[in-house]
Amino acid sequence: MKPTTIASLQKCKQDKKRFATITAYDYSFAKLFAEEGLNVMLVGDSLGMTVQGHDSTLPVTVADIAYHTAAVRRGAPNCLLLADLPFMAYATPEQAFENAATVMRAGANMVKIEGGEWLVETVQMLTERAVPVCGHLGLTPQSVNIFGGYKVQGRGDEAGDRLLSDALALEAAGAQLLVLECVPVELAKRITEALAIPVIGIGAGNVTDGQILVMHDAFGITGGHIPKFAKNFLAETGDIRAAVRQYMAEVESGVYPGEEHSFH
């Protein structure tokens, strides 16, 4: 199978072809996703909640991310694999580079970091040293204590303009992908159209170039609060492989996310 690359996603944006991505944390699910053609995966620090049982992503370490990245890479050798740099792993550009090197050696193709213009120097340093970067704006879970909970971001002209400015700054610094989480559809559309790089949404409506879901949300195996943007594809299909295919098909056709999964 031909490897999926950042250039593959860039072509999807140019061709206006939506694409699906998903979180993965282990060999078996990564292998299954790849076999069904879902070839863009993120080893997210969401594993702190979905795998480790914490109430936030904050306890996750670089070693945790590297461990799960290696497992996913063994299951999906040709996927485009993103890996989060967890909380306090990129406080300085030098620290970011050291920790990015660790997860890249474990098998990641790209690192994802949360934050806006304050990360410009870090993004520049990483890209200059051959570490591709995916930005993450909107609801950034590592900042949950600043936000006062998991809340929609970017509402209102001032907040929206600030997120757009952050997105443009990250792109100019060298970021090659951007995740937008829990922002109004109207803002997601502005940002997606303003950027040349692909934008992946989660809780950002169906106007972004791609979508991502935490796999536990996609299969309805998350306990407690269910995010508005989540959809249980397993409930509709009764089979994990069929659920993966359904998720991909609905993203590619624009059916998912629907209005009921979106914010304004």
Swiss-Prot record:
EC number(s)? 2.1.2.11
Whichever gene encodes this chain, its name is panB
Q: Which InterPro entries match?
A: Pantoate_hydroxy_MeTrfase (IPR003700), Pyrv/PenolPyrv_kinase-like_dom (IPR015813), Pyrv_kinase-like_dom_sf (IPR040442)
User: What does the record note on quaternary structure?
Assistant: Homodecamer; pentamer of dimers.
Name of the molecule in the record: 3-methyl-2-oxobutanoate hydroxymethyltransferase
In the record, the note on similarity to other proteins reads: Belongs to the PanB family.
Free-text comment on the cofactor: Binds 1 Mg(2+) ion per subunit.
Task: Tell me which residues this entry annotates as catalytic.
Answer: 181 (proton acceptor)
The subcellular localization recorded is: Cytoplasm
The cross-references to Gene3D superfamilies, in alphabetical order and at most eight, read: Phosphoenolpyruvate-binding domains
Q: Which NCBIfam families match?
A: panB, PRK00311.1
Q: In which pathway does it act?
A: Cofactor biosynthesis; (R)-pantothenate biosynthesis; (R)-pantoate from 3-methyl-2-oxobutanoate: step 1/2
Q: Name one Pfam family in it.
A: Pantoate_transf
Residues binding Mg(2+) are: 45, 84, 114
Domain of life of the organism encoding this protein: Bacteria
Which cysteines pair up through disulfides? They are none
What reactions does this protein catalyze?
3-methyl-2-oxobutanoate + (6R)-5,10-methylene-5,6,7,8-tetrahydrofolate + H2O = 2-dehydropantoate + (6S)-5,6,7,8-tetrahydrofolate
Q: Which organism is it from?
A: Escherichia coli O1:K1 / APEC
